[in-house]
From Swiss-Prot:
Residues 261-351 are annotated as: Alpha C-terminal domain (alpha-CTD). The keyword Transcription applies. DNA-dependent RNA polymerase catalyzes the transcription of DNA into RNA using the four ribonucleoside triphosphates as substrates. This is DNA-directed RNA polymerase subunit alpha. It comes from Treponema pallidum (strain Nichols). Belongs to the RNA polymerase alpha chain family. Homodimer. The RNAP catalytic core consists of 2 alpha, 1 beta, 1 beta' and 1 omega subunit. When a sigma factor is associated with the core the holoenzyme is formed, which can initiate transcription. GO terms for molecular function: DNA binding; DNA-directed RNA polymerase activity; protein dimerization activity. Its EC number is 2.7.7.6. One of its GO terms (cellular component) is DNA-directed RNA polymerase complex. GO terms for biological process: DNA-templated transcription. The lineage of its organism: Bacteria, Pseudomonadati, Spirochaetota, Spirochaetia, Spirochaetales.
Length: 351
């Protein structure tokens, strides 16, 4: 039986803040705070390892290269050590280039095979292997091979959806396919992850952790989606260690919110606050229904939201100040203090 107050006093982040500066489809920087001392490093290291090893993506798992002579007679390239006639690069180098290609298949596709035919003197790059509505190639400028006069080759690519790194010898299903050369598959779309821990202040304490996380991907998955997938993987692996009914646990987000007046304030509906029609509609469109939910949104996140201009942002901040609240709150102690002082003043006035 767990202690009902198991998480009492634990500071935990309420919002993952996306820093939009220099962000792109391939790069994102995020911050989360506050963490108890040491928890920022624990979470950051765990996320980094899972991001680099366990996010799913597409990769080439097998290649069949057929060379044709002047009479049109076909010959399968039997291994990575056999040279392709009238092609400048070694076959091993060409296979390594195919391994570096980054793909996207139509949503839901687990695997597919694509066939191409090339003739004459031409430099083949990633864009030459794209198939409209079937295969999107993101590394379009990657040089695959240079063909010379007299070259005539057919290339068959086997593209699959997978996780992590899978060596060529694991693709034993190609053993019965004549001419298919299995290759090492690098499925991970996450290229690099860096995290940093800084101190942050909550109330009178300045020893909490703030986690900054930078993620670089190949463009087949957005950085924020990769983080979400990594967090889900970690969460599912820890579930087996919980040997009690979590509904019996008193999951207090912030103990200082137990003050009835604070809870009442944070549960105030956005529709009941004197916002302008535009500001209210923007918040409701974002799915923000109460003042408590609004205080957990960072200023940067709100400013980057569509249809929230400077005027609306200023209005929202001003209205929160009237309630002794602000954007990006993690500590409600002062709200409780102000609430108690106001109640004491009302009691004195009534007396």
């Amino acid at each position: 039986m767990p202690r009902r107050n198991l998480l009492k006093g634990f500071k935990r982040p309420k919002v993952l803040e996306f820093l939009s500066e220099n962000s792109s489809e391939c790069y994102g920087k995020f911050t989360a705070s506050p963490f108890e001392t040491g928890f920022g490093t624990t979470v950051g290291n765990c996320l980094r390892r899972v991001l680099l090893s366990s996010i799913q993506g597409y990769a080439v798992t097998g290649v069949r290269i057929t060379s044709f002579d002047a009479d049109g007679v076909a010959h399968f390239i039997s291994s990575e050590f056999e040279q392709i006639p009238h092609v400048r690069e070694d076959t091993l180098e060409i296979l390594n280039n195919f391994k570096r290609l980054r793909f996207l298949l139509p949503q839901g596709a687990e695997s597919s095979t694509f066939t191409y035919e090339f003739r004459g003197a031409v430099s083949l790059t990633g864009k030459d292997f794209a198939k409209k509505f079937q295969l999107e190639v993101l590394s379009q400028d990657l040089l695959i091979m240079e063909m010379m006069d007299g070259a005539h080759v057919e290339v068959e690519l086997h593209v699959e959806f997978g996780r992590g790194y899978v060596p060529a010898e694991s693709h034993d299903r190609y053993a019965d396919l004549v001419g298919v050369i299995p290759v090492d598959a690098i499925f991970s779309p996450v290229l690099r992850v860096r995290y940093d821990i800084q101190s942050c202040r909550v109330g009178q304490r300045g020893d909490y952790d703030q986690l900054s996380l930078e993620v670089w991907t190949d463009g087949t998955v957005r950085p924020e989606d990769a983080i979400a997938e990594a967090a889900k993987i970690i969460k599912e692996h820890f579930t087996v260690f919980v040997n009690f009914d979590e509904t019996a646990l008193d999951l207090e987000d912030e103990p200082e919110e137990d003050d009835p007046a604070v809870l009442e304030l944070l549960n105030t509906k956005i529709a009941d606050v004197d916002f302008s029609v535009r500001a209210r509609n923007c918040l409701l469109t974002m799915g923000i229904k109460t003042l408590g939910e609004l205080t957990r949104i960072s200023e940067q996140t709100l400013a980057n939201t569509r249809n929230v201009g400077k005027k609306s942002l200023s209005e929202i901040q001003g209205k929160l100040q009237e309630y002794n609240l602000r954007l990006g709150m993690a500590d409600y102690n002062h709200v409780g203090v102000v609430s108690r002082l106001m109640r004491q003043k009302e009691e004195i006035d009534e007396a």
